[in-house]
């Protein structure tokens, strides 16, 4: 038995110019508020205005910005789990300096989102890269609601940050009190089995404990030491399988999940990962490279009351399937105003499916105007190329690995020299006299 589950979690992803299907609301996600006419300040200042202005939509899992003028859907999707800081910024008069990243630190403006030349600044990290996004409204109507938006953004971010237990596996946390698990809101205990062993991936001997199956997660804890415990939310499970014990006919019930920093003893060796199978389940490997995989194996040989492992695996499987079909992410904030959830992450000028023009909607074009069909095609091509080549690198502000020059102090050959192509936003191994991938082509 081995069941693989889709792991489409937009709150964990940071996507730039994502395909249309990545901007569709996932199960359990709902739109909270939307504002039109928002400028992406860090976009290339040479591109058309229709590419720099768009719609901001805030959901319970992410903040999405969608260009109103790009036929291929220039967009930004920032998962709330990737955000490290939210602040109020100060726009420079010289936009070229602003895009280059030369900025002044300004104290927050008493919770106001925008006043005059103020903007909202999002700092985020994803795949060991630091990103910075800056959004500024262009309409008077948006500015009048600035305080409302910033307060909602802060409230959603805090609510998401304080409900991690719904979405993230925790080890050795405060989830047990006086021999009983501390339940979440709306959580119900379905079954409880004693004397089930937890096996570590590095071969630590079994530790017997209580295996609790609830409506939201699996909880295991040791009665002798309640601080030794595990909480596994169903929405965070990558796979569920039965694994044979060497030298025995018995099997282990194994959960595979994305690892956190405090799970070193449960990390799986790379050669045991079935990466092709994981990628096959709808998410197509999005964000998978940023995950280490941890495995939690449970031994039911001494379970009280006795239960066949196949029966336990089937009941857990049903709970996971039900929870992932209708996930509860824990964030409870009512939507502000009327938001059409069918197209919540798409601007009002675009349809939810193909990012085309909705029936009955008049599209006002900006930039070069022409009456010829060929001219219109050229304009669309320019917009599409600009969004794919100029935007992504503009948001990267720091890196803990490849981008930039990495040289040894003594110029030794033990380290690679990496160069970041500013146009494509791709890091590559450089040679003397080469500053871009285009230069490599000329060779």
From Swiss-Prot:
Record keyword Cytoplasm present: yes
Name of the protein in question: BBSome complex member BBS5 homolog
PANTHER family noted in UniProt: BARDET-BIEDL SYNDROME 5 PROTEIN, BARDET-BIEDL SYNDROME PROTEIN 5
Subcellular location: Cytoplasm, Cytoskeleton, Flagellum axoneme
Annotated TM spans: none
Cellular component terms per the entry's GO annotation: 9+2 motile cilium; axoneme; BBSome; ciliary basal body
The UniProt record lists the keyword Isomerase: no
Family listed: Belongs to the BBS5 family.
Keywords: Cell projection, Cilium, Cytoplasm, Cytoskeleton, Flagellum
Gene Ontology terms describing biological process: cilium assembly; intracellular transport
Pfam families xref list: BBL5
Major location category of this protein: cytoplasm
Matching InterPro entries: BBL5, BBS5_PH
Molecular function terms from GO: phosphatidylinositol-3-phosphate binding
SUPFAM superfamilies cross-referenced by the UniProt entry: PH domain-like
